[in-house]
Amino acid sequence: MRVDQFDFDLPDASIALRPAHPRDAARLLVVRPGRLSPAALDDRFIRDLPELLAAGDVLVVNDTRVIPARLDGFRARGEALARIEATLHKREGGDLWRAFLRPAKKLRAGETILFSSGDAKLAARVVEKGEDGEVLLGFELSGAELDLALERVGRMPLPPYISSKRGADESDAADYQTLFADRPGAVAAPTASLHFTPALLAALVAKGVQIERVTLHVGAGTFLPVKAEDTDDHRMHAEWGEVSAETAGALNAARRAGRRVVAAGTTSLRILESAAGPDGAVAAFSGDTSIFITPGYSFKAVDLLLTNFHLPRSTLFMLVCAFSGLQTMRDAYNHAIAAGYRFYSYGDACLLYPAAPRGAA
């Protein structure tokens, strides 16, 4: 498909720079695709989720934890020092991270970069250099020691549409983590889950909604624009994820009982679809996924999708168009812009119904 079909104009004022407080005060647009008529759009709030979901529904959340993956440092250039910024995006080993560096044009394999924040310092060597500013960094520390050093040296990796307007501050350390954050490794938040509060979670459980956890370590590639003119020519970034055998069993039991699976976020949906077989059964999964979902995809594992509003021409907007229909999502986004919904990571959300039942092409 032509990528320009997924383009739209968004006023700069629609981009949220801070989250709603409390988190469940964010707005929620419920989108029900119409078969023979326009989509039904319902303006609600996140706190209405217990009313909108049914007893027996299974809500699948992503328990990844965002690490402080934005690093400031210097590299030697003759006798001078040149400033450099790194954004870690995928761990490749105990001391190895793939990262986007800028400026990176003059970097060479073997060079050393010294990252610092206050008195904290951390050195890394450029192991290999890739394309578009991507490098493989080998740090002087490994494993848990490296994780602790990153906590001291790194900054919260706010998305570029926020960081270009303001720097990260102390409030982002809490605001950009979800209630479910447990397993460190993400360099971007699974933003649909940012809306959950303990009170909302308790209300959902009291309603009879079952909560299951999966992991997908969201990479910085999630913000990369699609540069290709056709979706067939886009190379999707890989992210590491895991579905436990226990979670897979719970989802399959729910499916056999005719209960709905509700994905909290595109990350939860992508790892579930990666783990699902042709018959919709979910298997235990642990490894990389580079699943790229565009219109025409037949969803196998998910019945409803809770998700934020996404960037134009992004793989995530393509995914929601695949789920609920291209024209439906165009209509929904036009409504959201006109109604003053807040977009992107710190913004409001949609509860999407599918254009076709799962398993249907």
From Swiss-Prot:
GO CC, alphabetical: cytoplasm
GO BP: queuosine biosynthetic process; tRNA wobble guanine modification
GO terms of molecular function: S-adenosylmethionine:tRNA ribosyltransferase-isomerase activity
Keywords: Cytoplasm, Queuosine biosynthesis, S-adenosyl-L-methionine, Transferase
EC number: 2.4.99.17
Gene3D superfamilies in UniProt: QueA-like
Keyword Calcium (UniProt): no
InterPro entries according to UniProt: QueA, QueA_dom1, QueA_dom2, QueA_sf
Localisation per UniProt entry: Cytoplasm
Domain of life, source organism: Bacteria
Pathway(s) it belongs to: tRNA modification; tRNA-queuosine biosynthesis
Subunit architecture: Monomer.
Similarity comment: family membership: Belongs to the QueA family.
Protein's name in the database: S-adenosylmethionine:tRNA ribosyltransferase-isomerase
Annotated organism of origin: Methylocella silvestris (strain DSM 15510 / CIP 108128 / LMG 27833 / NCIMB 13906 / BL2)
Lineage of the species this protein comes from: Bacteria, Pseudomonadati, Pseudomonadota, Alphaproteobacteria, Hyphomicrobiales
